[in-house]
Curated annotation (Swiss-Prot):
Residues involved in Mg(2+) 1 binding: 418, 490
Similarity remark: Belongs to the type II topoisomerase family. ParE type 1 subfamily.
Entry-linked Pfam families: DNA_gyraseB, DNA_gyraseB_C, HATPase_c, Toprim
Lineage: Bacteria, Pseudomonadati, Pseudomonadota, Gammaproteobacteria, Thiotrichales
Keywords associated with the record: ATP-binding, DNA-binding, Isomerase, Magnesium, Metal-binding, Nucleotide-binding, Topoisomerase
Record-annotated Toprim domain positions: 412-525
Name of the protein in its database record: DNA topoisomerase 4 subunit B
Matches recorded under InterPro entries: DNA_gyrase_B_C, HATPase_C_sf, Ribosomal_Su5_D2-typ_SF, Ribsml_uS5_D2-typ_fold_subgr, Topo_IIA, Topo_IIA-like_dom_sf, Topo_IIA_B_C, Topo_IIA_bsu_dom2
Organism annotation: Francisella tularensis subsp. holarctica (strain LVS)
Amino acid sequence: MQNYNAKSIEVLTGLDPVKKRPGMYTNIENPNHLIQEIIDNSVDEVLAGFASKINITLYEDNSIEVADDGRGMPVDIHPEHKMSGIELIMTKLHSGGKFSNKNYTHSGGLHGVGVSVVNALSTRLEAEIKRDGNVYHIVFEDGFKTKDLEIIDNVGKKNTGTKIRFWPNKKYFDDIKVNFKALKNLLEAKAILCKALTIKYSNEIKKEKLTWHFETGLKGYLDHKLEAETLPAEPFIIDNFSNGDSYLDAVFCWCEDLSESIKNSYVNLIPTPQDGTHVTGLKNGIYDAIKAYIEKNSLSVKNIKITANDSFAQLNYVISVKITNPQFAGQTKEKLSNKDVTNFVATAVKDLLTIWLNQNPDEARQIVENISKVAQKRINADKKTTRKRIMNTTIRLPGKLTDCISSDVNSTELFIVEGDSAGGSAKQARDKNFQAVLPLKGKILNSWELDADTIMNSQEIHNIATAIGVDPDSDDISALRYNKICILADADSDGLHIATLLCAMFLKHFRKLIENGHIYIAQPPLFRIDIGKSTFYALDENERDTILTKNSKLPGKVNIMRFKGLGEMNPAQLRESAMDVSSRRLLQLTISDVYDDTEMLDMLLAKKRAKDRRDWLENYGDRASVE
C-alpha cells in the first residue's frame, strides 16, 4: 500500500470533477436532467421578465436544442478571468450571474454548475447568442473550447436570445435517449406554472410538435388531472400570494381515492421531487387551519386527536414558490432547504384556508370528517401494532428468512431473492452482520387489484410482510425491521416480471415504504467479462459491448460468460456483483413527479385493461424497463 501523504491528494480543476463523478451533478439514467438545466436557465429569463418563449428541438442524431428569446448570455470579456462570459459559464463550475439578486430576483440556477455540467458531459456543444445587434457563435467538444467566440451575423438590437445545442456523451449515461414522456410532462408543468410562457416542442425522432401556453395557470389543473370526487369540489387556490420578496401559488384538494394521487412541488419552476421546506410549510399551514377550525366549532371526536400527517394523507396538491435565494439539498436541486420558506408558506396557507373554511361550513365539515376517519384508521393500526408487540415479545419470523445479527434498523438490509437456489447462494454471499435473505418460491401473486386481507392469504406475501414488520395498506411503519428492502431477481425477462410484480405490490400495498426511501431493486449482471486478470460485470448487451470497447487494449484473453440466472452465480460472484455495498448497483424505487406510476402499472397488471396493455406492448414493448 502506498503512503498516504500530501502527494496523494488530487485537485480536480475545470470540469474534471463532473467527468470523474457525473452522478454527483446530474441523473445519469438519461440526458433529461441536462435538458432541464438549460430549460431552467431560460425559465429564469422568463421569471425576470426578459423572455416569453422557449423552443425545444430533439434531433434524430440524439442532440437536443433549447432556444429562448431572453437577453442572451454575456459575450463581453470578464475583467478577472480574461475570457468571454459564455466561455466562463461553460467551462468553470460555480460561475454565473445568479449568486446575487442584481440580475435575477427569482432563479433556480443557484449552484452555478448547471450548463457547465451539460458541457462537461457532451461530446459537442454549440451556443448561439443574439445580443447587442450581433449573432455570436462558439463551439465546445468534451468540455473544451474548440472554436472561439465569433460574430456570424447581424440582427436588430431588440432581437435577443440564447440557443444551445448539445450532443450527450454516451459514456456518461445509461442511455443517451431522452425520455420523451418525462420531458413533455416537465414542459407542460413549466407552462402551467408560468402564465407568461409559451413553450414549443419539436421531436424530429417521433415527428411530433406540441405547444403549451396556459393563461389560467394553476386554475383548473387538478380538475384536469383528477377524475374522482374531491373536497372541495373546486380545488382551493392560492394565486400569486406575496410577502414582498417571495411568491406562493398553490392548488390543493382532498380525495379519498389515492390511486390518482398528485403531489407536485416547484421552486422557481424547478421540480422538487423530494419536496422540502415549502411542502413542510404547506403541511403545517393546512394542519394549523384545520386544527383551529375543529377547536372553534367543537368538531373534535372523542379519543381522536388528528395529526399533520392525517390532514395531509388524502391531499392532492401542486405548490410553486418563487424566492430570491433558493438553497437545495444537493446539486440536482431535488429538495428545497430554505428554512424561512416554511414559515412564509405555513402562515399564508393557514390564514387563507381559515377564511375559506369559515365561509364554506358544509364542505369544511366534510373535510374534517374525512380527516378524522384517517386519524381513526391510524389509531386502530397503532393499537393493532401495540397488541402484536405485547403478545409477541419475540416476533415469529418466517422459517425461510435468514436474519442478520444486527437489530439496528438504520443499517440493516433485507434481500428478497427469486428462487430457493439463488436464495442459498445469497445466504452465503451476504454479510451476516447486517444483511438478511428471504427466498421466494416461484412467481409472486399479482396483488394489484386485491385487498390487504386477500393478499395475506398468499404465503409468500405473508412472509414478506412478517419479515419486514409492516402490514399491507398500513401507514404505520414504526415496526420496520430493515432500512433497505432489496428486490433481487434474475436479469432475464422472467426475473423482470417477478421484480415488476414485487414493485407493484410495494406501490399498491406498502406505499409508505417507497415514500420513505426503503425499497430498492438490485441489478445483478447478465454477463461476466474476464480480460486477462481483470473482471467486469455487465447488466446487458449494451453495457457488455461498451466494456469490451473501452478495454480493448487490455492484455490477455477475453472470456464472456452469460448468467442464465442468479442460481448460476457462485456466492463470491453474487456478493461482488449484487450484494457488496462497495461494488453493487442498487436502483431506489421512487414515486415519480412526472410519470403516472399508478396508471402505468394499472395498465400493465389490471385484468380489465387487456386491450390497453396489448396496444401499449405493440407500440412501446421493446422499450420497457423496470424503473
